[in-house]
Curated annotation (Swiss-Prot):
Gene: phaZ2
Variant or mutagenesis effect after changing residue 317 to A: Does not affect catalytic activity
Species whose genome carries this gene: Cupriavidus necator (strain ATCC 17699 / DSM 428 / KCTC 22496 / NCIMB 10442 / H16 / Stanier 337)
Enzyme Commission number: 3.1.1.22
Main location: cytoplasm
Any Pfam family matching the protein: 3HBOH
Active site location: 320 (charge relay system)
Name the record gives this protein: D-(-)-3-hydroxybutyrate oligomer hydrolase
Record comment: activity regulation: Inhibited by diisopropylfluorophosphate (DFP).
Entry's family note: Belongs to the D-(-)-3-hydroxybutyrate oligomer hydrolase family.
Any single GO CC term annotated in Swiss-Prot or TrEMBL for this entry: cytoplasm
Molecular function as annotated in GO: hydroxybutyrate-dimer hydrolase activity
Amino acid sequence: MHSTQIPPQQKQKRRLRLTVLAAAASMLAAACVSGDDNNNGNGSNPNTKPANIGTVTINSYNGTTDDLLTAGLGKDGLASATAPLPANPTAPTAAELRRYAIHTNYRAIVDTTASGGYGSLYGPNVDAQGNVTGSDGKVAGVEYLAFSDDGSGQQNVTMLVQIPASFNTSKPCMITATSSGSRGVYGAIATGEWGLKRGCAVAYTDKGTGAAPHDLDTDTVPLIDGTRATRAAAGKNAQFAAPAGATSLADFTAANPHRLAFKHAHSQRNPEKDWGKFTLQAVEFAIWAINDRFGAVSANGTRQRTLDKDRIVVIASSVSNGGGAAVAAAEQDAGGLIDGVAVGEPNLNMPPNTGIVVQRGATPVAASGRTLYDYTTTANLLQHCAARATALTQAPFYTNPATATFFANRCQTLAEKGLVSGANTDEQSASALQALHDAGWEAESDDLHPSLAVFDVAAAISVNYANAYAQASVTDRLCGYSFASTLTDLKPAAIAPAALASMFATGNGVPPQPPVQLINDLDPQHGPYLNLASVSPSTLREDLNYDGANCLRSLLAGSDAAARALQAGQALTLRNGNLRGKPAVIVHGRSDGLLPVNHTSRPYLGLNRQQEGVTSKLSYVEVENAQHFDAFIGLVPGYSNRYVPLHVYLNRALDAVYDNLTAGKALPPSQVLRTTPRGGTLNTPAPALLPSNVPPFAASPAAGNAITVNANAVQVPD
């Protein structure tokens, strides 16, 4: 890696001069082998494997029985709700887990219903130019799989490179697809689809997170391919093995059986601080893999680095946490690996006291630029109560008898604690909803609060990030929380062997997700108990563990050791806004209830302008009627009537950045994109999504749609 950065435009000119050389070199490429640890150190420009990369496994896929994008399932297989279950559920093979993981993760990110646009506006059968084809979308090619580690075996970040058979050495390209959420390495396969269709390599990483747990009962851990082994047998090959805290794992498990540890929460490494670094490492690994296949061979048989970083168009991409990782990578890219950025709904932790004012219409917004942990612990206190507001009676999951009493009890507790006002649930819930508005949520997010509350999303994220930032051990049970499977008595129970065996494929890395639940270990009536139905010690009421939620919130400003550790950990995750002159497009749904635009993409646009001034090449597109979870559009009644898929606009952002880098086409200016919901009522199927529902970026947005920015303010039209 060079110590100085080559500007993207200079890299583009250099690529044009070297196209003929690259094409000639590709003719000398030798066949690929099934495994590779060769550091290729004997040539004049050897293709040296990065020092952080361990043993590499290479698998080839023929594009018929198996492939890179659909794992042999094809377009219809991905759309099917019937998962490709392993033949032996308690002992799945690596190939079965891969297929299952691709099916699960693709469907977790996009809406796979035909009426929602799958198969017509996006999906494996829609080609790179947007044409609907008769293809099943299978993509032949190879995968390179390895750990990135510091030698300790404690990091073991999964790296995966997909190189399609259509990779064009005359026009080499690559995108990153860092996993969203806390998912495993296939977590952003739906983002990778864009690259595979264009013949680009895709650089994936799980960024130090992952779906499969360390089961403390059996002391078994996941390996890189999702299969499991005992911790002793796995050794340094474990994808994750939980470190002990003040208490040994054996002693902890004897006193607290059936608990599970997850890598993001319990690795004690605060992986988020390194998401940018891991994404850059994925790019470096991908460059090595590309040359391992296509690099020229010297006279002594050494593979050369024919296609280096200056010859490959590299776009950092992904969504949610993966999108935030792409932005972090661009900010940290001192070596000029990345040429452009195209991300959706990114998680962006803003630094404090930037002085940036976010204004919507003629009015500054109530709050902006807070961190994920700040606003999510706020939601974790208020959202369950706000979900009962009578203004939301037509919202998805408003009517949910299983949780209505718990939500009302939370309202009562909040009123007693002075956090909301009102004499009854209706008044208290209206107060809670207003408090969310005051904390920076737009009114467009209102209809999302009931469903997000039912899914306990804010609690899941608050617990996960509290542990991660504080670098807490699973044995610490920070704020009295733990993770375990439960049975009908709602108490911790041994996880079913088949469920555990497939969690690499089925999990998202952030409980609760059945069969793993969030446990309140401090319930005074039941003992350790399902958090959602548990009793708080201070109220002796089933109020969704208010005490736990309040404890998590207090860590943000507290002064004890855990609070100080959390605050220090969070400080390592803040963005700086300097994209180093790279062309970039961020798309974000205005209705996002998980990562609100006022705390993420809107203020980041201002932060970037502070850092880069008028030379900034960042465009921000705010999409009306889009929210965070496209997969819910086809799954949760009421979403399809209200929301359009943001995935359409991520693909268009990638198109725009690619066209800018390769053809000099201007990026779309920052704008509000006015979409049209599909319509219909809560419990009736929405009409099919049409192109007219999701219009393209405007090359010259009307004045009423243009987003403007200077070093001190971001102005977003109503």
